[in-house]
């Protein structure tokens, strides 16, 4: 029998319904795995007592044949989802001891459907990073190793703790957030399915903000079916979020294994012109061939303004961050640095200097600069205009195709210290994920192959607004085509 912590969400639900094991046994298997691999630093807060209490309640519901859709399923939450009575830090010193008195809508949705929370996962500070190396709790180490080197690798970022937890069988599923690729890129690096729904599908209420016009909750799982199950539980209109979309939550599970007949797949050839590793290019070509053989029609498309995505993103996102993070002043909550006879301005300065890490300070400074009166027209407003052009490119493409397929990241996972001193190179890791974020489109990363060094590589599927169904359909087809490949880190 498969170890309980290695079961997918779907298989866990089936086993619990069949009474093959209890939720408490399932949770304990995950707790054992978490304790065994604490060196990966995936979790920053463990909630084992809560999980066991929730598991006992789940077992009672199964005994009474009244299970909810996620009854007894162990999950983890990125540490920017506010959890009532449980520390929520965004992995920043400025919030290191913050305990919210309310619950985020997304975690509440999962609790309402029977989910069991194992803990809060590590992340880049305020979700700013692509390698999970900016956390005040230290780096996250990927469960994966290259076959020619024993060096520690990054799990990607900013949702690296969630990716490491699911990839290392320390959670059945894990919540992440995706602003410019923070679910899709880590999923690519760790051999997982990472899904970011349409902007507004999941409530942002109770999520610590980075860039409000881009932030969206996402999910890590080990199968496409699991993604569909979790998304159905997470999504839905929320009056507490002004950006929430009033749209019915679709039935998504029927997308799995459905026919690719009459599906047109767009391939943006202009995005493969540079900065992409040969292994990634080969897997991209193999994936297109796989979809063609499955009955899809392949259509070459051009996204003319996507190449400006990174530049646009690193104007808009820091601008929004500088505004959002102005609330951390040491007055109302979070860290406060004090000394005798200090002025209010000195308290602000000392608190923010001590509370924010270097990457967050860098982005606040960039954001403040581009919003200044001298630069607003030249940078911020121009970036917003180009963002609209990027969105229009997608609208034009989707008049001809049903989905777009391209890599989730231009490289395989890299060593922990390899790129941290060059932020520009780190920013370019989101080259393929940022355009869809700027347009607010649903997208997923799906494991599509292994590099020559035995590391997972993910392909990204981008869909039309509110068309999570077709994204899952294409992802499921790719998943079926590579089922002979074992996306499992050695030793786990």
Curated annotation (Swiss-Prot):
Its EC number is 6.3.5.7. PROSITE patterns: AMIDASES (PS00571). GO terms for cellular component: glutamyl-tRNA(Gln) amidotransferase complex. One of its GO terms (molecular function) is ATP binding. It catalyses: L-glutamyl-tRNA(Gln) + L-glutamine + ATP + H2O = L-glutaminyl-tRNA(Gln) + L-glutamate + ADP + phosphate + H(+). InterPro entries: Amidase, Amidase_CS, Amidase_dom, AS_sf, GatA. Keywords: ATP-binding, Ligase, Nucleotide-binding, Protein biosynthesis. GO terms for biological process: translation. Pfam families: Amidase (PF01425). The active site is at 78 (charge relay system), 158 (charge relay system), 182 (acyl-ester intermediate). Allows the formation of correctly charged Gln-tRNA(Gln) through the transamidation of misacylated Glu-tRNA(Gln) in organisms which lack glutaminyl-tRNA synthetase. The reaction takes place in the presence of glutamine and ATP through an activated gamma-phospho-Glu-tRNA(Gln). Heterotrimer of A, B and C subunits. NCBIfam families: gatA. PANTHER family: GLUTAMYL-TRNA(GLN) AMIDOTRANSFERASE SUBUNIT A, TRANSAMIDASE. Belongs to the amidase family. GatA subfamily. HAMAP family: GatA. This is Glutamyl-tRNA(Gln) amidotransferase subunit A.
């Amino acid at each position: 029998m498969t170890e309980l912590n290695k079961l997918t969400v779907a298989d866990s639900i089936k086993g619990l319904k069949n009474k093959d094991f209890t939720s408490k046994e399932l949770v304990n298997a995950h707790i054992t795995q978490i304790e065994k691999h604490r060196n990966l630093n995936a979790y920053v807060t463990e909630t084992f007592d809560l999980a066991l209490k929730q598991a006992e309640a789940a077992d009672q519901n199964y005994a009474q044949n009244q299970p909810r859709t996620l009854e007894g399923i162990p999950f983890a939450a990125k540490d920017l989802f506010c959890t009532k009575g449980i520390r929520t830090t965004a992995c920043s010193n400025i919030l290191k001891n913050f305990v919210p008195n309310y619950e985020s809508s997304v975690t509440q949705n999962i609790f309402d459907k029977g989910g069991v929370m194992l803990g809060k996962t590590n992340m880049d500070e305020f979700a700013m990073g692509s390698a999970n190396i900016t956390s005040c709790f230290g780096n996250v180490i990927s469960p994966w190793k290259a076959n020619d080197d024993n060096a520690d690798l990054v799990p990607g970022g900013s949702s690296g703790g969630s990716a490491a937890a699911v990839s290392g069988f320390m959670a059945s599923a894990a919540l992440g957030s995706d602003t410019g690729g923070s679910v899709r890129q880590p999923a690519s690096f760790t051999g997982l399915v990472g899904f970011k729904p349409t902007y507004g599908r999941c409530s942002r209420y109770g999520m610590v903000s980075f860039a409000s016009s881009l932030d969206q909750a996402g999910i890590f799982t080990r199968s496409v079916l699991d993604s569909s199950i979790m998304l159905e539980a997470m999504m839905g209109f929320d009056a507490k979020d002004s950006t929430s979309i009033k749209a019915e939550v679709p039935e998504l599970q029927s997308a799995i294994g459905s026919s690719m007949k009459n599906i047109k797949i767009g391939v943006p050839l202009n995005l493969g012109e540079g900065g992409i590793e040969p292994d990634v290019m080969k897997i991209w070509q193999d994936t297109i061939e796989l979809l063609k053989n499955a009955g899809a029609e392949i259509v070459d498309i051009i996204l003319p303004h996507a190449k400006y995505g990174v530049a646009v993103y690193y104007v808009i996102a820091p601008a929004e961050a500088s505004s959002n993070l102005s609330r951390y002043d040491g007055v109302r909550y979070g860290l406060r640095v004090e000394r005798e006879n200090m002025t209010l301005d000195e308290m602000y300065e000392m608190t923010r200097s001590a509370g924010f890490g270097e990457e967050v300070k860098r982005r606040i400074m960039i954001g403040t600069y581009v919003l200044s009166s001298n630069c607003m027209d030249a940078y911020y407003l121009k970036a917003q205009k180009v963002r609209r052009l990027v969105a229009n490119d997608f609208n034009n493409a989707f008049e001809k195709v049903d989905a777009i397929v391209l890599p989730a990241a231009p490289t395989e996972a890299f060593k922990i210290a390899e790129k941290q001193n060059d932020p520009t190179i780190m920013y370019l890791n989101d080259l393929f994920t940022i355009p869809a974020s700027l347009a607010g489109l649903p997208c997923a990363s799906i494991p599509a192959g292994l590099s020559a060094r035995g590391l997972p590589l993910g392909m990204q599927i981008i869909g039309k607004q509110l068309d999570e169904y077709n994204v899952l359909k294409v992802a499921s087809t790719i998943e079926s085509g590579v089922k002979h490949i074992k996306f499992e880190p050695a030793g786990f």
